[in-house]
Curated annotation (Swiss-Prot):
The modification Phosphotyrosine is found at Y127. The gene is PTBP3. The modification N6-acetyllysine is found at K423. The keyword Ribonucleoprotein does not apply. This is Polypyrimidine tract-binding protein 3. The keyword Ion transport does not apply. Keywords: Acetylation, Differentiation, Erythrocyte maturation, Isopeptide bond, mRNA processing, mRNA splicing, Phosphoprotein, Repeat, Repressor, RNA-binding, Ubl conjugation. It comes from Homo sapiens. It holds the Pfam family RRM_8. The modification N-acetylmethionine is found at M1. There is a cross-link at K65, K216 (Glycyl lysine isopeptide (Lys-Gly) (interchain with G-Cter in SUMO2)). InterPro entries: HnRNP-L/PTB, Nucleotide-bd_a/b_plait_sf, PTBP1-like_RRM2, PTBP3_RRM4, RBD_domain_sf, ROD1_RRM1, RRM_dom.
Length: 552
């Protein structure tokens, strides 16, 4: 460890703590300990202790186990989707690096993203943690010329003033005034491509704000708006020409002449991820005339990535089961989503990086109202829940074990941040690999339940249509399995008695076994689903409740 300490103090790292490199690895297999000599070179042969608490968030991040031949630009590329990278310190001899983001918020977003999804550089996993240091001071230090050159190049690209290739050509660069909107055409559309599929793929390269899908000239097309033109550039650079599914659904990506999208409705054709309050509308949204005209425009077409001097085309995103964006410079393979995705079992990016981690830690629950059964019903919307454990001594926390890591990721993505019984639920991946049942005679108060063989599992049948009807929580619920004798008033009164305010209701015209009911808020709908899913309606019919993608 002395070697690391000496090197870091020599290069002028501004210390925020007396401990150096002592915090726990956020997404690594073990915790680094400052007293263990082998942390200097990332030696896996040593056993690392788990006796150190994680560092508090810092805009300086510590990267471990970086490849010995990695470039400065490749390290920088890990941080670019999350914000501006302001400094870099490489310790190649120790397979380590320090990356400084412009803000602590950007660093937190980056760590949160890479917690369940281990990033790869040159096909090698890289582990990221907060540093004890609050700032990197590398002025006038030897061997920093390459790092500073890479940072300056990236800064120039982000401001649109320099070609990535370092020459006069504008090929593969972010042009001045380049649009954050991409125009996407799907060729060889053998399998359906949904708005959710596009969001999953393109969100790997930055924050997706809006998507509009449409069909023109018998081709499925989309307009997709990023928060930043740089994100759009990287997405086009990596994804243009790639296949979504094996040997089909090829992405053809151009830059749009539009600089912003006007989304009027949130439905299966269009989505504004910044405006969850938008109505569903009927069918394809109406478009403003300039936008409609733009559908036929070629857009600002940038040439394929020409290869930058020292700048990696790969953004360092992890390979995953199914959908993968390899992080090997210059080698972008197909985005092959496994065939199981066609039946709804799409691989969630990064889930393969946490084998067997199907347990979620759910926090900030209302201890007076939450029950294991309630969590089973709610999380069961997004996968088959096997076990639930509410903490005996801290009843606002619980563990939820899903059938697999994909389902855990899906439930976490949809439910974390939702309000439930007056509190904002938080869900993260747990360090536990399974929920243990209480030993015989152990006091538990019924807080641990095994639902492994529950008949209420929604996804136990392979290829079930339920896989195609997974939607985020909304104020509108989809009701099914309604017997013929049950009336509109019967169902309205059922929800009113459960404490809900019913705003609208309608039966499906072609099938009165199904209906939509719109409640006063998303929180009301979540609580109603917990309360009334599987409610006995008589005539051997139990009500089925799920979130709807539609509004009334």
């Amino acid at each position: 460890m002395d070697g690391v300490v000496t090197d870091l103090i020599t290069v002028g790292l501004k210390r925020g703590s007396d401990e150096l490199l002592s915090s726990g690895i956020i997404n690594g297999p073990f915790t680094m300990n400052s007293s263990t000599p082998s942390t200097a070179n990332g030696n896996d042969s040593k056993k690392f202790k788990r006796d150190r608490p994680p560092c508090s968030p810092s805009r300086v991040l510590h990267l471990r186990k970086i490849p010995c031949d990695v470039t400065e630009a490749e390290i920088i590329s890990l941080g670019l989707p999350f914000g501006k990278v302001t400094n870099l310190l490489m310790l190649k001899g120790k397979s380590q690096a320090f990356l400084e983001m412009a803000s602590e918020e950007a660093a937190v977003t980056m760590v949160n993203y890479y917690t369940p999804i281990t990033p790869h550089l040159r096909s090698q996993p890289v582990y990221i943690q907060y540093s004890n240091h609050r700032e990197l001071k590398t002025d006038n230090l030897p061997n920093q010329a390459r790092a500073q050159a890479a940072l300056q190049a990236v800064s120039a690209v982000q401001s649109g003033s320099l070609a990535l290739s370092g020459g006069p050509s504008n090929e593969g660069t972010v042009l001045p005034g380049q649009s954050p909107v991409l125009r996407i055409i799907i060729e060889n559309l053998f399998y359906p491509v949904t708005l959710e599929v596009l969001h999953q793929i393109f969100s790997k390269f930055g924050t997706v704000l809006k998507i509009i899908t449409f069909t023109k000239n018998n081709q499925f097309q989309a307009l997709l708006q990023y928060a930043d033109p740089v994100n759009a550039h990287y997405a086009k650079m990596a994804l243009d020409g790639q296949n979504i599914y094996n040997a089909c659904c090829t992405l053809r990506i151009d830059f749009s002449k539009l600089t912003s999208l006007n989304v009027k409705y949130n439905n299966d054709k269009s989505r504004d991820f910044t405006r969850l309050d938008l109505p569903t509308g009927d069918g394809q949204p109406s478009l403003e005339p300039p936008m409609a005209a733009a559908f036929g425009a070629p857009g600002i077409i940038s040439s394929p990535y020409a290869g930058a001097a020292g700048f990696a085309p790969a953004i360092g995103f992890p390979q995953a089961t199914g959908l993968s964006v390899p992080a090997v410079p210059g080698a972008l393979g197909p985005l092959t989503i496994t065939s199981s995705a066609v039946t709804g079992r799409m691989a969630i990016p990064g889930a393969s990086g946490i084998p067997g981690n199907s347990v979620l830690l759910v926090t900030n629950l209302n201890p007076d109202l939450i029950t294991p059964h309630g969590l089973f019903i709610l999380f069961g919307v997004y996968g088959d829940v096997h076990r639930v454990k509410i903490m005996f001594n801290k009843k606002e926390n619980a563990l939820v074990q899903m059938a697999d890591a994909n389902q855990a990721q899906l439930a976490m993505n949809h439910l974390s941040g939702q309000r439930l019984y007056g509190k904002v639920l938080r869900a993260t991946l747990s360090k536990h690999q399974a929920v243990q049942l209480p030993r015989e005679g152990q006091e538990d108060q019924g807080l641990t339940k095994d639902f492994s063989n529950s008949p209420l599992h929604r996804f136990k049948k392979p290829g079930s249509k339920n896989f195609q009807n997974i939607f985020p929580p909304s104020a509108t619920l989809h009701l099914s399995n309604i017997p013929p004798s049950v009336t509109v008033d019967d169902l309205k009164n059922l929800f009113i008695e459960a404490g809900c305010s019913v705003k609208a209701f309608k039966f499906f015209q072609k099938d009165r076994k199904m209906a939509l009911i719109q409640l006063g808020s998303v929180e009301e709908a979540i609580q109603a689903l917990i309360e009334l899913h599987n409610h006995d309606l008589g005539e051997n019919h139990h009500l089925r409740v799920s979130f709807s993608k539609s509004t009334i």
